[in-house]
Regions:
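Catalytic-loop region of hydrolases
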Residues: 19-105
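Alpha/beta-hydrolase active-site loop
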Residues: 170-192
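Loop/turn elements at helix/coil->beta-strand transitions in domains of secreted/extracellular proteins
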Residues: 90, 105-110, 154-159, 198-201, ...
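Accessory cap/linker subdomain of secreted extracellular hydrolases
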Residues: 45, 235-328
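Short beta-strand element of the alpha/beta-hydrolase
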Residues: 106-118, 127
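Fungal secretory targeting signals
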Residues: 1-19
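Primarily recognizes the serine-hydrolase "nucleophile elbow" in alpha/beta-hydrolase
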Residues: 185-255
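Conserved alpha/beta-hydrolase
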Residues: 114, 129-167
Length: 329
């Protein structure tokens, strides 16, 4: 009992200290613009003709967690790049954030696919990582920052893709995989880093990031075989989306099942039509909720929601067995 009490107090003090440090730093900086309002996230006309991995725009940024954790960087950059959507014939685009530590080892690259787990565009890692962004510090993100910090302190160049794409399509497998692989291409193409095309690469992901990593690993040979990926480290991987949906639906983390459906609806017109034909107003409200809240908001706001109830859809337990959606799971 006492151990639990002191652990809670320690976590509270740590988080409070971080929050105070962020507040102190924010007094001296300009708040970043959210992706829905930032023109950087919109490629210029003709971008579709570029090859996957082509850099469409770049900029320097300030990263919030490196300021708080006193990590000294040579530079922090964001790259808008061409990628592919649900197949390699569907042009798309997204952003990756590249962090370069002091005295970086310029012959290796590490990619971490953050667990965004939300359908809200303004929850993109590239936005939340920027100094001064709302919700820049929260308990879940702070845990992931520990891994980023360790990688940077070891001297590795780190790239963090917005692997859910421009619509933040959580659970849309091919979008996750393509965006991750093309983030590597774009990072290698960024001349400032002086990386070489055959430099060894490691990909890391947990939870929603592991889903992206799993699909990137699966698509590597067919989509981006030139990349010298020497290993993947993935944990908490939702490898079977149907099983994951059934496991979390109606429980504490039910919001993830709703977000997963919303991601497929936003990616595939046929799924949009199918779900539109069976969903109720309450179900539609639940989907929309995931497009307006970040991960913690989804977990709290949609706790215990059961998407197979008649109040949400008209076809209950057969929701995911229809031929329009089953092959995508």
């Amino acid at each position: 009992m006492y151990i639990r009490f002191f652990l809670i107090v320690a976590l509270f003090c740590t988080f409070t200290t971080y929050a105070y440090e962020v507040k102190r730093i924010r007094r001296h900086i300009q708040k970043p613009v959210s992706p829905t309002k930032d023109s950087f996230y919109v490629p210029k006309e003709g971008w579709e003709k570029a090859k996957p991995g082509t850099i469409l725009a770049s900029r320097k940024i300030q990263a919030g967690f490196t300021e708080r954790r006193k990590i000294h960087l040579d530079g922090a950059y964001q790259l808008l790049y061409r990628t592919s959507g649900v197949d390699d014939k569907s042009p798309s685009f997204t952003v990756t954030t590249v962090l370069v530590p002091k005295n970086a080892r310029t012959n290796k690259l590490v990619m971490v696919m953050p667990y965004e787990d939300s359908n809200f565009v303004d929850c993109a890692p590239s936005y939340k990582i920027q100094l001064g962004a709302p919700n820049e510090v929260n308990p879940i993100q702070s845990v992931e920052e520990l891994m980023w910090t360790s990688i940077l302190n070891d001297g590795w160049i780190l790239t963090l893709p917005d692997h859910q794409g421009p619509l933040s399509a959580f659970s849309s497998s091919f979008i996750h995989g393509h965006a991750s692989l093309d983030a590597l291409r774009a990072t290698l193409n960024f001349d400032t880093l002086k990386l070489q095309p055959d430099d060894p690469i490691v990909g890391i992901g947990y939870s929603g990031g592991a889903m992206a990593g799993g699909w990137a690993a699966s698509l590597h040979d067919s989509y981006a075989s030139e990349l010298n990926v020497v290993g993947w480290a993935l944990g908490g991987t939702p490898s079977n989306l149907t099983g994951t949906f059934r496991g979390v639906n109606g429980g504490l983390f039910a919001g993830f099942s709703v977000a997963g459906i919303a991601g497929l609806v936003d990616s595939y017109p046929e799924v949009n039509d199918y779900i539109g034909s069976v969903i109720t107003p309450a179900g539609n409200d639940a989907l929309q909720y995931t497009r307006e809240h970040c991960m913690m908001g989804i977990v709290v706001g949609l706790q215990n929601v059961n998407m197979t109830l008649d109040s949400f859809v008209s076809n209950g337990n057969t929701l995911l067995t229809d031929k329009k959606i089953a092959p995508l799971l």
